[in-house]
Regions:
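Catalytic cores of soluble metabolic enzymes centered on carboxylation/carboxyl-transfer
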Residues: 1-187
Length: 187
């Protein structure tokens, strides 16, 4: 267990295993999904999460920190989730990640999912010959976002807006109790 090993190290103890006990098998890829606007320099895009449907299936895991109906707040890290895939080969893991990104639905905020899709499909990434300057060198090749808004997104926005208005009208504005005006003696 990773947490147990972290606690052991924190207490000054050695790891409970050696490198000889670690075997490599398969490949795993993680894409961090942020509420960020890739087309504007990865600026945070806070707002409501109107729809959040995560991909599923063998070798696909999503560790989400935001739920549908929640909000990405301006004062916190805009991470929505970690999307992790694993497969027997690197090529299979990349293909699985592409499918996972394509089936991941988030409506309400811009996300880094299109950027993850761009990276997974880029020939330099696929070749394995990339470095930490990938974004700097290749982000300009990414197509601008599609401004077409699917009808389901429009419908989700309309429903959310109606629900917000209904909630506000039920709560009503705070009212200040008025005291009856009473004249004072001698005034």
């Amino acid at each position: 267990d990773l947490v147990r090993e972290q606690l052991r190290i924190a207490m000054g103890e050695p790891l409970g295993f050696t490198q000889d006990g670690v075997s490599m098998r398969g490949h795993a890829i993680e894409c961090r999904v942020y509420a960020e606007d890739v087309s504007h320099g990865f600026l945070p895009d806070p707002g409501p999460i109107l729809r959040h449907r995560t991909p599923a299936g063998p070798g696909v895991r999503v560790d989400a920190g935001v739920l549908e109906g929640g909000r990405v707040e301006v004062h916190y890290d805009p991470m929505i989730s970690k999307l992790i895939v694993s497969a027997d080969t690197r090529e299979s893991a990349i293909a699985r990640m592409i499918r996972a990104i394509e089936t991941y639905e988030i409506i309400g905020v811009s996300t880094t999912l299109p950027f993850g899709h761009f990276v997974m499909n880029h020939p330099v990434f696929r070749s394995g010959q990339y470095n930490t300057h990938f974004v700097e060198h290749f982000a300009g090749e990414m197509s601008p976002p599609d401004d077409h808004v699917p009808p389901s997104a429009i419908a989700a926005g309309v429903v959310w807006r109606a629900a917000e208005r209904a909630r506000r009208s039920q709560d009503g504005p705070e009212r200040i109790a008025r005291q009856a005006h009473r004249p004072t003696d001698g005034a």
